[in-house]
């Protein structure tokens, strides 16, 4: 694998590539498909193991099949392979339909990858692993939002046509043959599975070509945020690199001290003067949902709202309704983000002051960033996973009844520990206790269904073994640091969470 990466690096150093950005010949290199299959390209920075991304590992990479594939690519009159072609029907059909887009996605990522590495080296941004954690967002919000007044909850619109995705890539990739081949892939896939419809978000991809469409969606979101580039250049920022796709990252925009307007050739993209009256703007995003907060007035936030809507409609032909951007006052509103209901709460305090022989009481209020876990979205996720009914009553997981007892307990315990680990930042743990109760009782009902017994008999037979599996090691360690009474209200953020659990409703 190191030899393949060394050969690829040698190709990237060719002057012709630097001048013309000619990527199309890479499609005929065997090592590209090997790198794409096991995600060797930039795997240490950007990607999780293959099994975590939902790829089918049964189709092993075959050098002979790849050589035949490249030979047929050379023989094609058009720059695409039809899935209905009789030469590709058979046991290797799924391999062809998956390998070509995966290899092509790896090729398309090369210019962005080189640009990202060079920018990290130029700006001397340290690659701290704890910045990859999703929980690293919340300490930033806790530090900043308590001083702000308004928050804007934004849903980034998804493209309504495949051609829009290609138009956004033209400014980044100057290789016409590669873009033409990508257009063929998109139209073929659009005809196969009707990928993008008015009822489904583009973020829901088929597992076959997940890497390619994740790349396209992330490049689309990156372009939608281009209006905020001027904030990024003039702000102190902190990057959290997501391991799912390298363009999907979370930017932390800190306080802006000096803001300079950069002239642009396109007069329509010139930012209005009212943008710079209040430079204190904070922005954070995860996938297609972003939060923008500021100390500015409600009128200025509304101007931001309509500017974003018009910007997306005029320059990206995206139909973004103003109702997708909600503006609320932080002191009276909580916003849902990454599975937490976050807001700023006023905590009353009574301070006793004494001056000489006179003493008096002072009533004051302190703003505090508060995060809680809403119970109903979590129960809704458990209902979809068939752990309980709509009323929150635990039911047995019938599809797991054929597994061994230890396997069933381990599965339920793993889910419970992960949910507790992710929601450890909640200031109120009552909802988590209810989720743990549902999972424990669902586990007991599953075991009772398997052995045709009762829940009481199962709990009596297993005893403490059933309870110990649902306790986390972190809970035992933290209990030594904080007292039990304080632990119920203490927020704990872990810096090792790089992905959201499937049961966490974050959209």
Swiss-Prot record:
An annotated GO cellular component: chloroplast
One annotated GO molecular function: RNA binding
Record bears the keyword tRNA processing: yes
GO biological process terms on file: mRNA processing; RNA splicing; tRNA processing
Role played: Usually encoded in the trnK tRNA gene intron. Probably assists in splicing its own and other chloroplast group II introns.
Family as reported in the entry's similarity comment: Belongs to the intron maturase 2 family. MatK subfamily.
Protein name stated in the entry: Maturase K
Organism, scientific name: Nymphaea alba
